[in-house]
């Protein structure tokens, strides 16, 4: 098998299984350390939005934020960031911080705002409707 061959496994059918790339480790201690490292990186993404050391995804290391944090993954093409910012401008919401990283195929933007949950949810629905959106979610 080569890196260009599709990965097939019966485990791919389960929604509650996360498959990670093979990371070489020839000792029990190395395997345990790798397991802790992978779990830590998944936790940082799910809890904070950080994607440090990502291989096929834009890398972003994020500080903690006390307000609302929204994530937007999109096709890397002109106008997406403008459309995102317009959503908040139309609602009169100031963006406290914004982090953008792209690769050739996709962009990953994290938006921190000081707003209540209703406004954040409304913004999320508008972000999902932006052409080129792959995924958007309200992290917290």
Give, region by region, the residue ranges found by the protein language model:
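Rossmann-like dinucleotide-binding domain for NAD(H)/NADP(H)
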Residues: 1-64, 108, 140
């Amino acid at each position: 098998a080569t890196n260009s061959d599709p990965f097939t496994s019966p485990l791919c059918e389960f929604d509650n299984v996360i498959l990670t790339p093979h990371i070489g480790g020839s000792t029990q201690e190395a395997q345990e350390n790798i397991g802790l490292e992978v779990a830590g990186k998944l936790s940082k993404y799910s809890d904070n939005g950080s994607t440090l050391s990502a291989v096929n995804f834009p890398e972003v290391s994020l500080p903690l934020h006390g307000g609302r944090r929204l994530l937007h993954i999109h096709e890397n093409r002109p106008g997406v960031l403008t459309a995102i910012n317009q959503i908040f401008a139309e609602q009169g919401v100031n963006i406290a911080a914004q982090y953008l990283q792209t690769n050739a195929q996709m962009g990953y933007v994290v938006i921190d705002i000081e707003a209540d949950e209703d406004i954040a949810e409304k913004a999320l629905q508008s972000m999902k409707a932006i052409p080129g959106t792959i995924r958007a979610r309200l992290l917290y």
